[in-house]
Amino acid sequence: MAMDEGLELPETVLARLAAEVDACERRYARMQKLTLELLAFYGSRGLHPVLLKGLDSASLYEIPSLRESGDIDLYFSENELFAAIPKEAVHNADNSWSYVFRGVEVELHDHILDIERPSARREAQRIASESPSGSVEGLPAEVRGLSPRMRILLLSSHLLKHCLGRGIGLRQVCDYALARAACDYDRRIFEADCRALGLSRWVAVLDNLCVRHLGLDGNFSASYAERERRRLDSLSDRLLRRLLDEGNFGRESGRGKGALNTFMAFLSNMGFSLKLAPGEAFYTVLSLAKGRLKKPSPSGKTQNRSL
């Protein structure tokens, strides 16, 4: 793709961009290698991990290797989770487990959607049971990923979790916008799922942001009365300011990342959170508080200690 005449970038900038692209592609290749190795390891021990985000989200892009790599997130059924946890794993406030595998952080989850409200969690379990896992484009057939329906719900709920707390990054918003545009799913079912999970207002704000600022087709945003549309515009503008101030744009790296700092971040954002998803905001803070007080141990359970 060529820039318009007069807008060409200086050679020094082009050289830096070329170096960054090369580094990004190398990180992606390493992430792919480690992810496949880890999935094969678990599979050889009779476990059935499902890939969340990461390479699954990268498959949505025209050039997957140009999506910046992050952590490796895997879902295990409740019956398999403790068998998958290595002895060095740390329990997190959100009830996931994390450890480092060859320099890359791995997170293990016993639920797919980042939902805390009890009645909504039951709905999340129902939706997950109706949406079997599938393959991931560009990866071996034995790699299990999410169905289009679950992928979009995961990305939207995960974005909400970050928005309620430390802030969201542009990469995650782009993942969501691409999933909305590219995945084959029934939009009426998606809207019903959002109502059942208490995500309708949040998804409306997120869609508004993606349509107005990221080029998502306006057809993906429902029609609203003028007063409600202005309210959504205002909330998405506020969300955009947070997007530019936090996440990939620098401020997050300066914060403490312990459980107490995470808890305080959620409390400090409560005013905005209550306008987006009040029930989820309340139960997320409650869950984090409980998670700090009680940290379950996998001792006594069958563990995988060979990683």
Residues of each region from the PLM?
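Conserved NTP-donor binding/palm subdomain of two-metal-ion nucleotidyltransferases/polymerases, i.e.
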Residues: M1-G70, Y75-L307
